[in-house]
Amino acid sequence: MTNEELIAEAVKITREYINPQNVSIGHVGCALLSESGKLHLGVSIHANCDVGFCAEYGAVSSMLVTGEYKIKKIVAVHTGGTIFPPCGKCREFIYQIDASNLDTEVVLEKDKTLLLRELLPEMWQARPLK
């Protein structure tokens, strides 16, 4: 799947919805390709008391349900079509699911990707005290 096709899948699932409790649902959509080539999707939920989550969490959760852990390529897109790189929490989350995800291609533009390891040079890991 090309970057443009993956971006289009993420855009398809975004929506401008705010429920009566002022919770924003679906303003960001995420599409990822697992190692097997299967497409997984997720949307963001931003609640008032900070109990929501980024779209990447939804897409990764969808992948985990199928028994896969490795991500080949991922993109997150706002309703207006703007591509967002994963936030720091999502970068760490993707790495924590499987260390080989450091080689995940993160789509930053239609023609530009970086590996997760380039966006997360100092991932969390136990280090001995010196």
What are these regions (language model features)?
Residues 42-50, 78-82:
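A short glycine/serine-rich beta->alpha loop
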Residues 38-39:
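Hydrophobic "anchor" residues
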Residues 27, 43-48, 55-58:
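Conserved mixed alpha/beta catalytic, RNA-binding, or beta-rich assembly cores of soluble enzyme
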Residues 1-20, 68-130:
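C-terminal binding/interaction regions
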Residues 24-34:
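Short beta-strand scaffold segments in enzyme catalytic cores
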Residues 54, 58, 89-92:
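Short amphipathic alpha-helical face segments that pack within enzyme cores
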Residues 55-75:
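Short, solvent-exposed cationic patches
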